[in-house]
Regions:
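Membrane-embedded alpha-helical segments of small multi-pass membrane proteins
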Residues: 1-27
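Primarily secretory-pathway and cell-envelope proteins
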Residues: 32, 47, 52-80, 109-169, ...
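N-terminal post-signal-peptidase region of extra-cytosolic proteins
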Residues: 87-92, 130-135, 175-176, 229
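A glycine-anchored, Pro-Gly-centered beta-turn/N-cap motif
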Residues: 88-102, 176, 180, 185-188
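Extracellular beta-strand-rich, repetitive "passenger/adhesive" scaffolds
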Residues: 78-94, 120
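Acidic, proline-/serine-/threonine-rich low-complexity intrinsically disordered repeat tracts
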Residues: 36-45, 58
Length: 259
């Protein structure tokens, strides 16, 4: 894998790992506790950001971009349409194009989508804060001054404030990000591969338990990887977030009855 958040920014890494990788280079005090999560498929031969003078990835946590540069990176063919708070794929400035708050990001149930959040660092200067590859749906907290690039891979998908989300998932739970105690109940879950999603990604199938959506080096409290034919068990409590990346979570009692 090419060293630095800049490649993660463009290509991403599976699930919330992309955010962890960003944290490792955005924060010079990062302690490396998530290094074992990284996918090592990248050989470092491609430098998509050389035009921006960021060849020294060892110092990439300090890299910044203008809004124009961010738009150039992702292309100019995005719709960037907002209708009644619902956003098409595009690039949005929080506080200007959309309101701050918690957002629900639609995604394909079996294919990868991406989003990137940039922090405002100064006048027309932004540093990357989050880089996420996800399957299903996701949530992200946006603050005034942030810039988000929402790239779900399908022009029909939308991003909108959580209050507008009609979301009532039923077990077993497919790929996506869930609020424990709100979207799904606390308890023990059996984690198994979601074959149709796993077939469409080169990243590892896994369940991530997070205590918050800050993506700090201690945000992830548990990770369970699963391979074809395998099963893992994860326990979550109210207030946690459970990300399912190409896996299915079945309540333990339901899984036991089915076995």
């Amino acid at each position: 894998m090419l060293c630095g958040c800049l490649l993660v920014f463009l290509l991403g890494i599976g699930g919330c790992v992309g955010c962890v990788a960003c944290a490792s280079y955005l924060d010079p005090n990062y302690n490396g506790s998530f290094d074992s999560y990284y996918d090592d498929d990248y050989d470092g031969s491609y430098d998509p950001f050389d035009d921006y003078g960021n060849g020294d990835y060892s110092d990439s946590y300090s890299a910044s971009f203008t809004l124009s540069e961010i738009k150039d990176i992702f292309g100019s063919d995005l719709a960037n349409a907002v209708e009644d708070g619902s956003c098409s794929p595009g690039i949005y400035t929080v506080g200007e194009d959309i309101d701050p708050g918690l957002y629900f990001l639609e995604g394909d149930p079996v294919l990868e989508g991406n989003f990137y959040v940039f922090d405002e660092e100064g006048a027309d200067s932004y540093g990357i804060d989050k880089s996420v590859v996800y399957i299903g749906h996701y949530l992200t907290e946006l603050e005034r001054g942030d810039v988000i690039a929402y790239l779900p891979g399908d022009d029909a998908l939308r991003m909108y404030p959580i209050a507008k989300a009609s979301f009532a998932p039923e077990a077993p739970y497919q790929s996506g990000l869930y609020r424990v105690g709100t979207d799904i109940p606390a308890g023990e879950y059996a984690i198994t591969p979601q074959k149709d999603a796993a077939d469409n990604t080169t990243n590892e199938s896994a369940a991530y338990v997070m205590k918050d959506l800050e993506f700090d080096d201690d945000s992830i409290t548990d990770t369970k990887y699963v391979i074809a034919g395998g099963t893992q068990t994860v326990t979550v409590k109210d207030g946690d977030y459970l990300e399912l990346f190409a896996v299915v979570a079945t309540p333990a009692d339901q899984a036991e009855k089915a076995s």
